[in-house]
From Swiss-Prot:
Membrane is among the record's keywords: no
Transmembrane feature ranges: none
Name of protein: Large ribosomal subunit protein uL22
Species in which this protein is naturally found: Treponema pallidum (strain Nichols)
Similarity field: Belongs to the universal ribosomal protein uL22 family.
Length: 124
């Protein structure tokens, strides 16, 4: 059994909370690339825009490496949203006090592969 070739793209240090981006990633995980991009285009979240950029990069990497591929044959195999570093900012409060506000960052990794169809039309 031959192993399928995967293509990936990774973006680091995006200023977005991983807990807010993960639900968007779960919507498009394990879907065909074209359908996933259409879904992301209709979502109003900031995370949808960020994931869309990384998915375009992964598809571009795949097409650059293998010229016979096109976007209709790509499949989103995995999306990982990892936690990045946190920026600590001072938030001034009343009576001379201050609170620490954490600006969270995330790393997004998208893995795409070629979708293989069997003779009966189902995915294999």
């Amino acid at each position: 059994m031959t192993e399928r070739v995967t293509y990936r793209a990774k973006t680091k240090f995006l200023v977005a909370s991983p807990t807010k981006v993960r639900p968007v990633a779960n919507v498009v995980k394990c879907k065909p690339y074209v359908r996933a991009m259409a879904l992301l285009g209709h979502l109003p979240h900031k995370g949808a825009r960020l994931i869309s950029k990384v998915m375009k990069s992964a598809a571009s990497n795949a097409i650059d490496r293998d010229k016979r591929l096109d976007e209709e044959r790509l499949f989103v195999r995995d999306i990982q949203i990892d936690e990045g570093p946190r920026l600590k900012r001072l938030w001034c409060r009343g009576r001379g006090r201050g609170d620490v506000q954490l600006k969270r960052m995330c790393h997004i990794t998208v893995v795409v592969e070629e979708s293989v169809r069997t003779k009966d039309g189902s995915k294999g």
